[in-house]
Structures are given as structure tokens and as C-alpha cells.
Amino acid sequence: MAADSTGSESTRTAGAVADADPADSAAPGMRAADVGRAARQDLQFRIPRMPVVRRGVRMRRDDDTWVLDGGRKSQVLGGAFARDHLGALLQACDGTRTLAQIGETTGIGPNGAFEAVSLLWTGGIVEEGDTAPLPDPQPAPELACLLSRLGDSTGVNDSWQDAARRLAAARVAVTGDADLVGELIGALDPTLDARAADAEPGDTLAVVLGTTGSPADGEAERCWGLGVPLLRVRIEHEAVTVGPYIDPGFSPCL
């Protein structure tokens, strides 16, 4: 179904994509036209310029609907647009086409493409494909897949490549019980270059490992004074408690 020059056809077809299954969606009945309208007005919406389907997720056809597998939540997209056009739209979201080109390729027009892609982005199905390639060595495929899938949960990075760049540039200090510090650093390698040391100004994160015999409260207070974000990890008996994450930039207290 091609979009007409007024955009009304694209709005109607894109709106049909958003008929989500109330049992599976956090926003039942959300329509692409509504999401697209919000995306044009809210700067928190960063709709991909050249969308690509996220790694580790799959849109599966089920009769007249499409089911999202691998996302942070189960979703079902239905309606006439989903039945007739969503397959072609997903194929066009390969990271090489702009929204205008996707609209032309699929016949839904630029407005319909914007609305439909806005919905797919809100649902964690697509991310930004217009990003600079990563330098060698490349991240492990498993890490790339994880970063892509988690991107929708955090909403911080436009693409998994952006997340990988931030991860590679991170300065992480791990402090606390010496034996546990060594084990954690070994587990993080080679995903993250962490060091066994007290936090220093400019660090991205300090992981503070506390035990019954070594509570590490003093190091947490030191991080707070330096303005370094910290993640508390408490190990006692047979339990491990991760959190809270404390950022002096917005956390009210330790």
C-alpha cells in the first residue's frame, strides 16, 4: 500500500503496526502514528537515521501478526500494515538506507517510514546503523550481540558500536577484598580493562567489594568525595548483593 502525497495513507498504515498484544506489551494498543507524533516533539526520542534490526532479536511471522523474540519484553505487532508491509520494512532496515529511502523502497512514504521505525525503535527492535566502524580488534560476537540487545534496556547508546566504544574507553577501579578483586578482574577480562586499585579522579566507575570482615565503607565514602560513580557489591555467607549503583552526579546519598 503506497503512501499518498498528503501522508494520510502512511499514517494509517503505520498506525496499524502498533496494535500490540495487551497480554505481552507494556503499552497495549500503542500505535505507530502516536509514537511518531511523540518522537517529533520529544528530544528523548532518538529515532535512527539509518535503522538496522538489533542483533540477537528476531521478528517471527505468526499468521497475521509478528512476534518479537529475544527482546527485553514479549511483543506482538498486528494490524493491516503488519500483515502486508512489516516484512518488507524489516528487510529494508539493514543499516544502509535512510528513512526516506526506506519509505520509497517499501512504498509507505517517508512519513509512514518515520512512524513505523519510531514504533520499532520504541519496542527495542531496531537501533542506529549510521555509525562509524570500530577499530580492530573487534569485540567478540557474543559481546556485540549482548550490547545490541541491552541497548534498548538502557537507552543510553544509539548503537551497540557506541556502547562498545564507551566500554573500551572506560576506566574501572576494583577495590575491597584482595582475593575477590582478583577473581572479578579475571572474570571481566577481556570484556573490560579493570584494575585493582583505589578510585582516582576521572575514573568511570569504582566497584567496591565488601564482605563481613571487610565492609569497605571507607572506600565508598572516598569515591563519593572524589565524585566517582560506584557500584557496591556485598558478599556474605552464601549470598551476593549487587547494588546499589551510586552516582554523585544525581544520587542523594551513599
Regions of interest found by a model, annotated:
Residues A2-G7, R12-S74:
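Long, low-complexity, charged/polar intrinsically disordered regions in eukaryotic proteins
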Residues A2-P28, R72-A194, R232, A239-T241, ...:
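Long, charge-rich, low-complexity alpha-helical segments
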Residues V35-R37, D64-V67, G71, A80-F81, ...:
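A generic structural signal for ordered alpha-helices
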Residues A38-G56, L119-L120, G218-R234:
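Short, charge-rich amphipathic segments
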